[in-house]
């Protein structure tokens, strides 16, 4: 006889609660919506305001929640166990925090980031075609902010930041900030975006794709130095 199906973990039994509900007009387009949402989030990291990023992150979490309600739970992988463990520790720390309001705010922020992770994991597991599209979104955002930052050198430099360290040979050096209003923030964004552009340049095929990755790599590296 066939072995009895293993019941999903108690924590995941809510998933698939709406699997038998009538499908709406957007049910067949969940992958498209999730992909566009994640691409907009990745590309908009250096371009969108903090309020805009908050809306994109919240929308990503809500979209994952709707997708999870219509998808039966699967096996909990090793990485997801670590993620659930971190979430459990965060909930425990929030409960024992001497400043519960601030701790609760931090917990909500963590859960919103985990919602983005969960949506990305779900999308890439069911539609791997979005891998390259999401990866391309981050260098696209870095390319735009790098161009804006480099152009700042050819405009009025009176408002640009300058290196303030009298003991350094770089004292007084002009520092660009692109769309992020702070050279350190621009450098912090470019540090992970540049390796992704390099990987894309080595992996992608086609002249247009490679030219895009090369432009993001070269201009991002130049902007990083100029920060």
Regions from the PLM with identified roles:
Residues 1-105, 115-139, 200-212:
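Transmembrane signal-anchor hairpin modules in multi-pass inner-membrane enzymes, especially those
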Residues 37-42, 58-64, 91-92, 115, ...:
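Alpha-helical transmembrane segments of multi-pass inner-membrane proteins
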Residues 100-108, 176-183:
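Membrane-embedded glycan-lipid processing machinery
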């Amino acid at each position: 006889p066939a072995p009895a199906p293993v019941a999903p973990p108690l924590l995941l039994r809510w998933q698939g609660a709406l699997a038998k509900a009538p499908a709406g007009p957007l049910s067949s387009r969940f992958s498209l919506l999730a992909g566009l949402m994640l691409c907009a989030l990745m590309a908009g990291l250096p371009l969108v305001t903090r309020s805009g990023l908050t809306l994109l992150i919240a929308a990503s979490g809500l979209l994952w929640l709707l997708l999870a309600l219509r998808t039966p739970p699967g096996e909990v992988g090793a990485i997801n166990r670590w993620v659930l463990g971190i979430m459990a520790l965060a909930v425990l720390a929030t409960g024992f925090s001497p400043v519960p309001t601030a701790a609760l705010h931090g917990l909500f922020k963590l859960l919103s980031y985990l919602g983005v992770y969960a949506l990305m994991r779900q999308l890439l597991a069911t539609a791997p075609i979005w891998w390259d599209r999401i990866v391309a979104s981050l260098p696209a955002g870095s390319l735009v902010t790098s161009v804006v930052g480099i152009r700042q050198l050819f405009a009025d430099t009176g408002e640009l930041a300058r290196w303030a360290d009298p003991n350094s040979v770089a004292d007084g050096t002009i520092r660009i900030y692109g769309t992020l209003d702070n050279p350190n923030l621009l450098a912090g964004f470019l540090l992970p975006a540049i390796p992704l552009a390099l990987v894309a340049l080595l992996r992608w095929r086609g002249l247009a794709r490679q030219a895009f990755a090369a432009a993001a790599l070269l201009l991002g590296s130049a902007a990083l130095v100029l920060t």
